[in-house]
Amino acid sequence: MTPRSLWGSGSGLDQRLLDLTAADDRPWDSRLLRWDILGSLGHIEGLRASGLLSARDHARLRQGLRRALVAAEQGAVALRPEDEDVHTAVEQWLTRRLPGLGERLHTGRSRNDQIACDLRLYLKDRLLTLQADALDLVDALLVFARAHQKVLWPGYTHQRRAMPSSVGLWAGAYAEGLLDTIESLPELWTRVDRSPLGSAAGYGVPLPLRREAAAQALGFAGLDRNVATVQGGRGKLEAAVLFWCTQLGHELARLAQDVILYSAEEFGYLTLPHELATGSSIMPHKRNPDLFELTRGRAAALDGDLSSVLQLKSKLSSGYHRDFQLLKEPLMRGIDRTESMLASMGAAVPQLTVNRERCAAGLGSGALATDEVMRRVEKGSAFRVAYREVADTLGRGEAVAPPSASRIVARRRSTGGLGDLGLTAAAARSRAARRWNGQERGRFERAMARLAGRGPRGGRRGR
């Protein structure tokens, strides 16, 4: 028996066409099931406010959709092999239980604005979860930095020892680097937090839709006002989200690379606990940093997810194209990668051990050369003269007298330096970002709870 679609006259589809257009998409489409039902609950609020749905029909549809939501959470609603997409699965489930009335659900709506709405609800949920996970890692790094702020080790330029640094400065730098990306989410959020409903296929509908009512019911801050921009922006929004993820990914990849390098026997600054290292099937002494290597690799793969989206959207004319369906996989896969990296690194950082003796030994005479130059400058030498004198000393193979660790720190009291890491200010930034996250999570969950007819879930969600 050939499946039937929501479009056309209801004639059967060739199974080969369905396989080509839908089979690979179902695993990704299935993730939108909850959001499709909630989006439909918001849509019928707009229909009721527009006078396109009677109070009685609205109440029955709302009850049916709420039952669908419960059934979906219990696994009783799912995409079947004969369903073309998540929208088909939900509408046909509803229509089987509310014959005639279920067929009113799609009034004033296209699958084009429907999927755009589903994706934005999905993105709001996932972005808030990713930001919270990133803040957990920031806080772990700040705790690590505070615990080791006076442990000196060499700082590197060109992968060569350069000047004194500290474990605290290193960890604090990664915390602030992550915060820079975390704090950019509110700007991206303004683009996600706009309702596309009512734009239909991209040109609106000849009905008196009150688009604002559906947007308000779904907790969106506003509308994508121009109906054509909803489809024109497909791929653009996904790319913006993945770019935000790649910025987190790049920071995590650099952090992972440092841990891999500094935990190698040749450095020995950091030690991985047994719980974070794997072994070899042939070499019994090995403790491999697989977690960090795979974080580095996933960050590279995340770049590929962004590239896929950019390539898919870059050469299309205005209006809707079926190519847009292929945006879901790299988007969701990229978000999955980001979540996995944040979770693993957040768990790993507190378990790293610092070898103070190896760190101190790593400084060496070369890394202290600039300190000697500045010591002579403070005594009255011109900088360039002092620079040449120290260079000549080192060139003859002679070492410069090393200052004490306390002296090294004491001479670096400028804001953000070894003697003043600014960890309190970074922690304040983290708390501010958490407050924003909590406010937006609360607003989002309250809107979803009202639609579902239940109390807000609270906490984090995902997938």
Regions found by a protein language model. Name each.
Residues 61-65, 218, 263, 274-276, ...:
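A general structural motif at alpha-helix termini
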Residues 43-53, 169, 239-247, 371-379:
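Short, well-ordered beta-strand elements within core beta-sheets of diverse protein domains
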Residues 1-204, 209-216, 278-279, 292-294, ...:
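A helix-coil-helix interface module used to build multimeric assemblies
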Residues 54-55, 222, 383, 400:
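Residue-level detector of short coil/turn "hinge" positions at structural boundaries
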Residues 1-39, 97-101, 283-463:
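Glycine-rich cofactor/substrate-binding loops
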Residues 119-120, 124, 131-132, 146, ...:
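Charged, flexible cofactor/metal-binding loops and thiol motifs
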Residues 45, 49, 70-77, 95, ...:
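Charged/polar positions within long, soluble alpha-helices
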